[in-house]
């Protein structure tokens, strides 16, 4: 009986030793304990929460679309009436905030479609507007695109009350944000495209006849 007890005691001691060895081996092999695993999980969650909460302030980014439409005789520009603040009720170019998983051009095309239902085969990035006070909500940079398309029916959707084509001499006063400057710069840049007959201009003119192109050039004006 005593021999059996001693044997059992020796086995118990041996089991404890083996367990300790396994535990130590696990530590040396980098296997995390439960507490360490929980700490890693918390740290990961904190990192995800802080992903965009950097120490230094940083601006938001939007895109805007200056779209010129040709109806066969004249060139018009597409505007939307804003349905929310800031500048609620004012006219502006279709645009909005860039999403995390899209390029600037993808964002511009998405906003154009969401707010007006319009799609275009080609848009040209022409300027970034970065004045610190251009948006009363926060620091916002906007990347602007333009295109010339055949005028088609549009409809205000999403956060746009309505979408409408305006003749170049009938554009409403006091456009939202810095969009009056945006229109001026767009016309200056597109005039350069016309004067130099760039590949981008040729791309925009696909689908238009030579006669139509001449009318478009006359409407937009040759600016130095």
State each model region's role.
Residues 46-92, 105, 120:
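N-terminal strand-loop-strand
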């Amino acid at each position: 009986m005593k021999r059996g007890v001693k044997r059992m005691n020796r086995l118990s001691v041996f089991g404890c030793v083996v367990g300790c060895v396994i535990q130590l081996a696990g530590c040396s092999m980098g296997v995390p304990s439960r507490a360490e695993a929980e700490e890693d999980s918390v740290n990961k969650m904190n990192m995800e929460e802080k992903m965009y909460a950097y120490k230094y302030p940083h601006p938001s980014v939007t895109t805007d679309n200056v779209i010129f439409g040709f109806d066969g005789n004249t060139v018009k520009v597409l505007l939307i009436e804003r349905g929310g603040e800031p500048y609620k009720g004012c006219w502006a170019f279709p645009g909005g905030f860039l999403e995390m998983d899209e390029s600037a051009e993808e964002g511009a095309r998405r906003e154009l479609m969401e707010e007006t239902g319009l799609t275009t085969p080609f848009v040209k990035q022409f300027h970034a507007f970065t004045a610190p006070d251009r948006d009363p909500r926060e620091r916002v940079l906007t990347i602007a695109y333009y295109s010339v398309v055949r005028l088609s029916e549009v409809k205000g959707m999403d956060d746009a009350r309505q979408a409408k084509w305006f003749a170049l001499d009938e554009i409403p006063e006091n456009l939202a944000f810095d969009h009056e400057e945006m229109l001026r710069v767009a016309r200056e840049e597109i005039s350069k495209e016309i004067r130099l007959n760039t590949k981008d201009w040729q791309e925009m003119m696909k689908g238009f006849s030579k006669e139509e192109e001449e009318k478009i050039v006359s409407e937009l004006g040759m600016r130095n």
